[in-house]
A protein has these predicted regions:
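Soluble non-cytosolic domains of exported or imported proteins
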Residues: 11-18, 83, 161, 165-169
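Conserved polar/disulfide-associated segments of primarily extracytoplasmic proteins
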Residues: 29-154, 159-163, 201-223
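N-terminal low-complexity, Pro/Thr/Ser-rich intrinsically disordered segments
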Residues: 1-9
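Surface-exposed amphipathic alpha-helical segments
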Residues: 24, 153-197
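Proline-anchored loop/turn motifs at beta-strand termini and strand-loop-strand connectors
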Residues: 13-31, 175-181
Length: 223
């Protein structure tokens, strides 16, 4: 990882730019609220930077089952019983057909934690990584529990087991380099206003997130 060369990636619609290791692939998805950036090494896909600006899950299986009846898009509906960072990732991986195991909480509160863990992907592949998300609860009960868990600024930085120490600085630097354009931020604010009746913008500081992540990780190594 110390000899990594970088390219500047420019999203074709002008939504963002970022630095990525030379030869890595970038995929994007979601709408302006849930926007996803997935950066990975085609030769070693466990090396991955996954960013999602907003993701949600239902706090009850009954709520998810009811919503599935109206889920015309065919998207996976996750069950995340608690509004915590750990519950978010446990529910996310389980919904994808895998699993998540917490190894250590590196810092933060339960709803805004920095986690060190390992995951099993649906195909059985093992990964090791650092995970963070700012999580809140959207309360809604109407006979059954339709409350939702919402994760914002979701960040997943992973490698094959045993590689994280070598690769985390590179993964963090790339995630930190993301620059969203004014065009994207304006479109996202418009979407938030339509959905929630309020305005929202990208308030997270990527620099602050990366500084915290690396400081916590280095403190763990020194122990």
């Amino acid at each position: 990882a110390s000899t990594v060369e970088y390219d500047t990636y420019e999203q074709p619609d002008g939504y963002f730019t970022m630095q990525i290791p030379k030869g890595w692939a970038v995929q994007t998805g979601g709408d302006f609220i849930s926007y996803i950036i997935d950066v990975y090494d085609p030769a070693q896909p466990q090396r991955e930077i996954y960013i999602q600006l907003c993701g949600t899950g239902f706090q009850s299986a009954e709520g998810a089952a009811l919503a599935q009846n109206y889920n015309a898009s065919g998207e996976t509906l996750f069950v995340m019983p608690e509004a915590t960072t750990l519950s978010y990732f446990e529910g996310w991986y389980q919904g994808l057909g895998g699993s998540f195991q917490l190894l250590e909480t590196l810092g933060g509160e339960a709803d805004n934690a920095l986690l060190y863990g390992k995951a099993t992907l649906p195909n059985g592949t093992q990964t090791e990584g650092v995970y963070s998300a700012v999580v809140s609860s959207l309360e809604y009960n109407y006979g059954i529990n339709l409350s939702m868990t919402m994760g914002q600024n979701v960040r997943v930085l992973t490698t094959a087991p045993g590689e994280l120490d070598a690769w985390l600085p590179t993964l963090s630097a790339c995630a930190d380099s993301i620059q969203f354009s004014e065009l994207f931020q304006n479109k996202r604010a418009e979407n938030w206003s339509q959905v929630l009746g309020t305005s929202a913008s990208l308030s997270a500081s990527w620099n602050a997130m990366t500084d915290q992540m690396m400081a916590r990780w280095e403190a763990r190594i020194r122990q």
